[in-house]
UniProtKB/Swiss-Prot annotation:
SUPFAM superfamilies: AraD/HMP-PK domain-like. Its cofactor is Zn(2+). The gene is rhaD. Zn(2+) binds at residues 141, 143, 212. GO terms for cellular component: cytosol. Its main location: cytoplasm. It is found in: Cytoplasm. It comes from Klebsiella pneumoniae (strain 342). Pathway: Carbohydrate degradation; L-rhamnose degradation; glycerone phosphate from L-rhamnose: step 3/3. SMART domains: Aldolase_II. This is Rhamnulose-1-phosphate aldolase.
Length: 276
């Protein structure tokens, strides 16, 4: 008989967190991951739920998430340990009927709680639900090394970061034509950074937190992981290019436009117009 550990969403979270750890993106308890589920996903595993689910109020109501279940990583938990003890490091939560709080249905044992970045996740989920008609289901935050490094040497401007990442690897414009948003440095784990991230998610599926990390949104765990992985690969190329004296040639504006036409995507116009 299968248990909730065998469920696709638990196994998917195990793989995503393990892969992120192996990439070097999630040292210690760095990073967090949430996946929005359907009632049909969790209903077969009701026998595994806690007898008395704990209730935690949200700092602000989120009615668009009412009655929505999620699987989330825990606060203070190490990605490298998720595969060893999923129930201690992950949790299935369900937002209540008015969006004021949530019950912990499964996991997060020993009185653990969801990630401290849950406000940023839930606010971003709310915006991406509206923007994509519910298609986007994943929010991933990690400390991608080369993306962080670039925030120290490039002007922290969305159009510039977008253009440089597009130039760093040909596939980037195809994978994230909506570009990369970037915030000013802010204290993590607060409603303020959560709100700023969510507002930026209205325009971009990738949002950089300077000197800290990156947020990504997508329809599946694979798509969201791949989004960040693609941007991080380009950032790695750029870090190496900058260390070798900078670009001598690159993909031109006209070539980027041709690339967008070939793959039927609309590149962020302000990034295209930044320079020839």
């Amino acid at each position: 008989m299968q248990t909730i550990i065998d469920a696709w969403f638990v196994q998917g979270m195990i793989k995503a967190t393990s892969d992120a750890w192996l990439k070097g993106w999630d040292e210690r308890n760095g990073g967090n991951l949430t996946l929005r589920l359907d009632e049909a996903d969790i209903e077969p595993y009701a026998a595994d739920f806690h007898a008395k689910p704990r209730y935690i109020a949200l700092s602000q109501p989120m009615p668009i998430l009412a009655n929505q279940p999620f699987i989330v990583t825990g606060s203070g938990k190490f990605f490298r340990n998720v595969q060893l003890d999923p129930a201690a490091n992950l949790g299935v939560v369900k937002v209540d009927s008015d969006g004021a709080g949530y019950h912990i249905l499964w996991g997060l044992t020993e009185d653990a709680v969801p990630t401290s970045e849950l406000p940023a996740h839930f606010l971003s989920h709310s915006e991406r639900i509206k923007l994509t008609g519910g298609k986007d289901r994943v929010i991933m935050h990690c400390h991608a090394t080369n993306l962080i490094a670039l925030t120290y040497v490039l002007e922290n401007h969305s159009d510039l970061f977008t253009r440089k990442l597009w130039e760093g690897s040909t596939e980037c414009l195809v994978v994230f034509p909506d570009g990369v948003g970037i915030l000013p440095w802010m204290v993590p784990g607060t409603d303020e950074i959560g709100q700023a991230t969510a507002e930026t998610m209205q325009k971009h599926s990738l949002v950089l937190w300077p000197f800290h990390g990156v947020f990504g949104s997508g329809p599946t765990l694979d798509e969201t992981f791949g989004l960040i992985d693609t941007a991080e690969k380009s950032a790695e190329v750029l870090v190496k290019v900058l260390s070798m004296g900078g670009m001598k040639q690159t993909i031109t504006r006209e070539e980027l436009i041709a690339l967008g036409k070939r793959f039927n995507v609309q590149p962020l116009q302000s990034a295209l117009d930044l320079y020839p």
